[in-house]
Amino acid sequence: IHMPWILCNMHARGYAGCNMHAGCKEAGCKEALFTLGDKPELRYSTAQKELSKLGFQTTLEYLRAMALMVFEETGLLPHLNPGLLDAKDITSLREVSVSMGIMLESSSDRLMEKGNCHHGSPDKAPSVRLSTIDDAGRQKVPFTTGILIGSGETRRERIETLLALRKSHEKYGHIFSII
């Protein structure tokens, strides 16, 4: 389920979108995937205005409501990929989802340096992404994650990224999929 923020009205898309997906269960679908960016209301005034019209202060409040609605109306199991989350966010969303995820992409801080692919993107910092992954683990949330190949990383950095994910999983036992 794509939750667009700028090009279409969130109210119409949210509620009509749910009706559109009602036939998914009959087609054999079991899960509804919600994927979106990191708190777009902080970056785009249009997103904040749309949320406000709907009576929500944050994207995560809206996501929580939509995940619950999809589950109640269709029986599809919500899997949430909403970007960076803190422990409080995970606690709130855990009540309306069967699993969550975020791509680690890379554990290399080098990719954050000027001239590299994650420069100027604080949400891509390995430490904050690993923090979300570990917070989910502490709460026993089934989790999916992954690495990004082809972004300028070295073979060694790919291996280190996989090892960082293994370390988190060995500690908490929550990662069920690495893509």
Please tell me what each predicted stretch does:
Residues 2-5, 11-12, 17-168:
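Conserved Radical SAM active-site core
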Residues 139, 171-179:
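A glycine-rich, aromatic-flanked flexible loop/lid motif
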